[in-house]
Amino acid sequence: MKKIAIFAKVHDPRCQGVASELIAWLEARGLIPLVEAHLARHLGGRQGIVPEDIPVLADMAVVLGGDGTLISAARLIGSRQIPILGVNLGSLGFLTEITLDELYPVLESCLSGDFQVTERMMLTVSVERNGEEICSHRVLNDVVINKGALARIIDMETEVSGIRLTTYKADGLIISTPTGSTGYSLSANGPIVHPSLECITITPICPHTLTNRPIVLESSSGVTVWLRSKDEDVYLTLDGQVGMELKCGDAVHVRRAAHRTRLVMSRSRNYFEVLRTKLKWGER
């Protein structure tokens, strides 16, 4: 590994300081830091790299911040599948499981080829309007269809691999990966799914029926949701970061992505320990 991409929560002074130290550490070892352009502007005018160019150039990425910063970097890196080392400088750090104290020892191991990664399934989502695809994205966590603040419950006709599932009457719908199962889906009473599993979870948000419970599908399933509600404010949100307004008749197509996100694992803890310490899982 020669070229190391650096992403950080750009408006956080602590992240900026750690990024500056990391750049110096890499350069002292003859490595090439590729600093994302937005971050570079906060580091004394250092020349940065356009975000879209980084995946092609980098051999590895280091993300300084919280889970949101890592998720954003994962979507950007996409099909390149370079390993991502997430360093927790945020509040929760469920995905960014490497601590600041572990950063340089773990990075040394990565550079020598002695590291483990966990591969996380991603989803691709596209929106079809009047028979035409108007957008397409990849997500690591979830695809959310949600009503606006003043809208009534919405109708979402749903198919799985061409077979009718149901028409949800609810505040919204969450379609998540195993990684996303501990995010918004969990708050809506969705199941916790181990990240090594290959599946897609559909979780309704406040369904107007007692029988609409979350459902877990095999990963090869294709999910299509048609918005059937008129005159309501409805939005599509991807990983809680990218969004657009939906119109009646729009079809949202979701399927497993061809590529995965590769996260560098901490050798000092496992998934269940992270569940207990980060989410207080199993505590009374």
From Swiss-Prot:
Role summary: Involved in the regulation of the intracellular balance of NAD and NADP, and is a key enzyme in the biosynthesis of NADP. Catalyzes specifically the phosphorylation on 2'-hydroxyl of the adenosine moiety of NAD to yield NADP.
Chief location: cytoplasm
Localization terms from the record: Cytoplasm
Binding positions (NAD(+)): 67-68, 141-142, 152, 169, 171, 182-187, 241
Gene3D superfamilies, per the entry: Probable inorganic polyphosphate/atp-NAD kinase, domain 1, Probable inorganic polyphosphate/atp-NAD kinase, domain 2
Cellular component GO terms, alphabetical: cytoplasm
Keyword Aminoacyl-tRNA synthetase listed: no
Stretch forming the signal peptide: none
Protein family according to the UniProt entry: Belongs to the NAD kinase family.
EC number, as in UniProt: 2.7.1.23
Database matches in SUPFAM superfamilies: NAD kinase/diacylglycerol kinase-like
Catalytic activity: NAD(+) + ATP = ADP + NADP(+) + H(+)
Keywords per UniProt: ATP-binding, Cytoplasm, Kinase, NAD, NADP, Nucleotide-binding, Transferase
Biological processes per GO annotation: NAD metabolic process; NADP biosynthetic process
Originating organism: Geobacter sulfurreducens (strain ATCC 51573 / DSM 12127 / PCA)
Superkingdom of the source species: Bacteria
Protein name, per record: NAD kinase
Needed co-factor(s): a divalent metal cation
One function term, GO molecular function aspect: metal ion binding
List of catalytic residues: 67 (proton acceptor)
